[in-house]
Amino acid sequence: MSIFRKKKGAEGEYLACRFLKKQGYVILQKNYRKKYGEIDIIAQEGGDLVFVEVKTRSNSDWGSPVAAVTKQKQRKIIRVAQTYLAETELFDEAIRFDVIGIILDENSPPIFELIHNAFELEKFNGIF
């Protein structure tokens, strides 16, 4: 991954945290990594533990950033989330998976698209 893309991604994650805080989320952890994947943001919102994937783009020429969260990426996020739940012993928490897309065009303010419950754990049960 190029330095430009890493920098753009880090900027997107920073802006996503600010945006989510304004929406009432409490950020618990950023960049939770395991050898098989990463969760960008883990937060609490209402009574839910929320695993958030952040996708940042320079423009929408290739479509919405949230559309880049493929089924394969969803599986990785779910696998990492299951590890997080096991490590923290938060098995009884209500959880959900949100995706936030950010368009960072240098000529205009950032555009945010937040999708609550973007995908569900039940759809992938038994695949690991």
UniProtKB/Swiss-Prot annotation:
SUPFAM superfamilies: Restriction endonuclease-like. Belongs to the UPF0102 family. It holds the Pfam family UPF0102. InterPro entries: Restrct_endonuc-II-like, tRNA_endonuc-like_dom_sf, UPF0102_YraN-like. One of its GO terms (molecular function) is nucleic acid binding. It comes from Desulfotalea psychrophila (strain LSv54 / DSM 12343). It comes from the Bacteria. This is UPF0102 protein DP2807.
